[in-house]
């Protein structure tokens, strides 16, 4: 990887602008999951320990661009960092005209998406952000697939632009899966829609030995094979695509095991009774909401035989306890495996959190869309600009 790392640069006394992904869930002003903050803390602390004057940028949620909304404010994040760092931390709302910051001090800037032009990678905005620093550090893997002012444009115009430790770790973990994976490789791809993961599914059938579809994706494959799925979520417009992927998988020597038994309900509800059924017994008014015990055993056996595991998406509606057995069993099987395992995506991370398996998965990616695009073989714009800038950087 032709990238200059943050650790290659002397940061002492320099203004260091770090783009992190601090987009955490906040309810009633309280952070409900600090996973992304914990992932970002080592980078921020390292820069402060080096004697840098540190400024942090991030987005939070999806506010209307250019409009302040308190529920999308990064102030609770600044409070969290203040409590978890032994350095002074200030929260600054207006920063585009300049920020006074001292070595050994951290300034947390307000949500970058409150700035008009952020998503469009506005040149004037990017230059204002770049003027805040001597060194720009891109550490937000979760937004590296977006060419925006705070991820791409600022890297174009900053005096020096480098990759942060978290970004490097993410890319190295994915590289281990993409460049020299140990076989057999098993991928679990769940979620509601084939359409959102069509490119990924096509890419994976040429790369992995076993591709286990889950959730609405599995339902679409089942329907494409002529099985009764009742009123289950599926995509009628993508049945031909599903059939094409099954044919492609056969040509490539990739196994796509489909459920042989399922757990159904009559409504999508936390209080809905759950019933185990063989696939041949699914009724016209049934809704498939999880995989059954026989399928769980089959999938767990496949996972135990793997040397590399990729996990993106649940295999059932794990938010409802009666439909969580499949996802829980898959998660535990991955955690217990000796294989190199990488997990990514919001629902996947929520499941890892729920079952307290953070320490047992080889690598947990902080990215959703960026994670998928890497697996699809795409170049991430924010990484590409760092590679371009690396050609001209002096590391002193």
UniProtKB/Swiss-Prot annotation:
MF terms (GO), sorted A to Z: ADP binding; ATP binding; phosphoglycerate kinase activity
One GO biological process term: glycolytic process
Protein family according to the UniProt entry: Belongs to the phosphoglycerate kinase family.
Gene from which this protein is expressed: pgk
Originating species: Legionella pneumophila subsp. pneumophila (strain Philadelphia 1 / ATCC 33152 / DSM 7513)
This protein's record includes keyword Nucleotide-binding: yes
Subunit structure: Monomer.
The protein's name in its UniProt record: Phosphoglycerate kinase
Source superkingdom: Bacteria
Record-listed E.C. numbers: 2.7.2.3
